[in-house]
Amino acid sequence: LAFGGETPPNTAATEEWNVGVALGAWVTGANGNTARGNLAGAGTSTSTLAFGGFSPAFAPPNDDRVRPDTEQWNGSVWAVTNDMNTARNNLAGAGVSNTSALAIGGDDNDGYTETWDGSTWAEANDLNTAREFLAACGTATAALAFGGEPNVADAELWNGTNWTEVNNLNTGRVK
């Protein structure tokens, strides 16, 4: 599932990979509710969570450009749900469904972590090394966060409560 992004301008478009065709193909899905780039996601093609991001369409003083928005994908449509506690973009996400996820790091090199339980975000223990443009994988209770800006090789393991520094990447990079 591919959703949102900077084209430019930012898009709310959704595309699904169709494995029912011999070589596979992308098909258009329902658009998200807010066009934004630099957002994060977690889940599968039928149970996805999209959160955070940046939307130039919103500008002060009416609305901030960095978004706290969260949307859930059920395999057919996006539904707006509760916002993150801290609006940010350039963050990473981890999790295997739209009911259990992590929002990790993000703009201004923050180390914030939030957990999603299917209806609300909760503040959790921060990364040891604050950063943005990082990558992550895993579940909401066992995740790995790595790389990021400012061009770090740091890797950290999440156990559902705390982040622990583990062996670094051989080469620091940003996503």
Positions of predicted regions on the chain:
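Polar, enzyme-active/binding microenvironments
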Residues: 1-175
